[in-house]
């Protein structure tokens, strides 16, 4: 059978990253777009001719949106086998039109239950019902229906439609369907774990299965053997190929895998935000920045430390465009990671044969358990995935932080948790200015961060400082004040908090407590 041309699309997303541009392109390709609730409003406000799902069902959205897509005219349009005459006749008799493309991502259940103040009622309201149902129907009928759950796949679908007379390829539809069942499996497991209380207390016994996925030449050092194993536990199965596709370069090493995990864990803090670039070396960020374009974000991240990025790993939260790729191409980097690569970018970057190019195909799972092996047993802990929002910040000084200071502090806090302790981090205008990582003394981390900034002539006046744990004494804060810092973000909780607060007030600093520590060993 020939690939079915996409004529009608059903779009309903919680994460609206890229959805306006995607649907605008679909409309230009002649696709009729139907949508629901907030997604419909977003599209119509952007001038896109999207119609309400109610025009298909003839039934309004009811019960605060709990019931809107659970309807025979939706699922019949998704599940009908186009080559089956009985299905086609029944569809015609019941006024059911085929739906060729489903674009759905789910209510953010995992992000919701990761909030420290989440209520049971909030958790329940964020259990998606209609979304998984549509995804599963579309994925089951992947012979005829294209299903997209991740904004990183928008570019791929559009490119195939342009090159294939409005259709996607069979192998693409199958790969996207596989992502659906992996997503819904993880989603249901997260709900079951939350309802069982498994997110808060490890069981007295666990069953974990490891299956070798990739062989490696050696481990952290040449004298150590190593491999990457697919892991199956109570949260499902996780493997490298579930989330990544290596597009170019020699085989990934043990150290590469550690750096990829570090880079992607950090860049995902900025999923759906402005263009952001993360540069990693030995699992620590040496530069992170956000800007209106990826190229500018890269240049700003690189300016934090102009030596460490050589041979490093760079991750992007938007598809890598030619301008940014050209800037990155000026130095040697081990790995570039992006959700997509725009036309011509891969061809240029592939000219350096030793560089690895990796496409992130889907978001890493949030929550779940983290395992660390020791010579005397396995340590198990919840992943450090809890989110601090602006509403969680407690201002403890006389001076309130400005909006710009709050924005910089939130940016710094997202990065801080991904740096080896002890961590002191200086940020200004959504750019790292000085990174002090992995020191036994918090004072030494502060000195290193200041020294790194001075080495590249970055002026710390007007910056903010983040500390992954409380300041045990006022000396660390006073050093930051001397450097020109105007605001401080830290967990709080020291027996000398009052002393530190007094020092902040004496220097007219704004300081906020997060109430959450981010040690990383």
From Swiss-Prot:
Catalytic activity reported: (6R)-10-formyltetrahydrofolate + 5-amino-1-(5-phospho-beta-D-ribosyl)imidazole-4-carboxamide = 5-formamido-1-(5-phospho-D-ribosyl)imidazole-4-carboxamide + (6S)-5,6,7,8-tetrahydrofolate; IMP + H2O = 5-formamido-1-(5-phospho-D-ribosyl)imidazole-4-carboxamide
Domain MGS-like, residue spans: 1-149
GO cellular component: cytosol
EC number: 2.1.2.3, 3.5.4.10
One Gene Ontology biological process: 'de novo' IMP biosynthetic process
Metabolic or biological pathway: Purine metabolism; IMP biosynthesis via de novo pathway; 5-formamido-1-(5-phospho-D-ribosyl)imidazole-4-carboxamide from 5-amino-1-(5-phospho-D-ribosyl)imidazole-4-carboxamide (10-formyl THF route): step 1/1; Purine metabolism; IMP biosynthesis via de novo pathway; IMP from 5-formamido-1-(5-phospho-D-ribosyl)imidazole-4-carboxamide: step 1/1
Name assigned to this protein: Bifunctional purine biosynthesis protein PurH
Origin species: Chlorobium phaeobacteroides (strain DSM 266 / SMG 266 / 2430)
Chain's gene name: purH
């Amino acid at each position: 059978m020939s690939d079915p041309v996409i004529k009608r699309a059903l779009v309903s997303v919680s994460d609206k990253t890229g959805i306006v541009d995607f649907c605008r392109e679909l409309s230009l390709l002649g696709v009729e777009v139907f949508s629901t609730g907030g997604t419909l409003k977003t599209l119509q406000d952007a001038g896109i001719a999207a119609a309400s799902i109610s025009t298909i069902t003839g039934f309004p959205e009811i019960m605060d949106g709990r019931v809107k897509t659970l309807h025979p005219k939706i699922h019949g349009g998704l599940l009908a086998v186009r080559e089956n005459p009985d299905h086609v006749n029944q569809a015609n008799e019941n006024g059911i039109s085929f739906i060729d493309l489903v674009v759905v991502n789910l209510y953010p259940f995992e992000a919701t239950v990761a909030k420290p103040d989440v209520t049971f009622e909030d958790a329940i309201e964020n259990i998606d019902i209609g979304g998984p149902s549509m995804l599963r129907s579309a994925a089951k009928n992947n012979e005829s229906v294209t299903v997209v759950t991740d904004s990183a796949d928008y570019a791929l679908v559009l490119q195939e439609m342009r090159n294939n007379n409005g259709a996607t390829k069979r192998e693409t539809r199958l790969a996207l369907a596989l992502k659906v069942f992996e997503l819904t499996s993880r989603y249901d497991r997260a709900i079951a774990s939350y309802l069982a209380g498994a997110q808060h207390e490890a069981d007295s016994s666990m069953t974990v299965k490891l299956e070798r996925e990739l062989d490696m030449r050696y481990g952290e050092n040449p004298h150590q053997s190593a491999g990457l194993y697919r892991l199956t536990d109570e949260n499902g199965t996780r493997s490298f190929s579930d989330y990544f596709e290596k597009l170019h370069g020699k085989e990934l090493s043990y150290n590469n895998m550690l750096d990829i995990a570090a880079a992607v864990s950090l860049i995902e803090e900025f999923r759906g935000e402005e263009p952001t670039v993360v540069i990693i070396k030995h699992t620590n960020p040496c530069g992170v920045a956000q800007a209106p374009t990826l190229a500018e974000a890269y240049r700003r991240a690189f300016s934090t430390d102009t030596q460490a990025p050589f041979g490093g790993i760079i991750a992007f939260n938007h598809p890598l465009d030619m301008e940014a790729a050209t800037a990155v191409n000026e130095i040697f980097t081990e790995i570039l990671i992006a959700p997509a690569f725009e036309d011509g970018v891969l061809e240029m970057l592939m000219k350096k044969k030793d560089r690895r190019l990796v496409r992130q195909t889907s978001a890493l799972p949030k929550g779940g358990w983290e395992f660390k092996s020791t010579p005397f047993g396995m340590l198990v802990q919840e992943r450090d995935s809890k989110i601090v929002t602006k509403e969680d910040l407690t201002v403890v000084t006389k001076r309130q932080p400005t909006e710009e200071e709050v924005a910089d502090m939130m940016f710094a806090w997202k990065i801080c948790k991904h740096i080896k302790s002890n961590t002191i981090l200086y940020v200004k205008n959504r750019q790292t200015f000085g990174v002090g990582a992995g020191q036994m003394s918090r004072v030494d981390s502060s000195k290193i961060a200041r020294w790194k900034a001075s080495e590249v002539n970055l002026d710390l006046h007007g910056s903010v400082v983040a500390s992954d744990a409380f300041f045990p004494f006022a000396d660390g804060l006073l050093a930051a004040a001397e450097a020109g810092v105007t605001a401080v973000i830290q967990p709080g909780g020291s027996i000398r908090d009052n002393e530190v607060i007094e020092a902040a007030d004496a220097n007219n600093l704004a300081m906020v407590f997060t109430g959450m520590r981010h040690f990383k060993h």
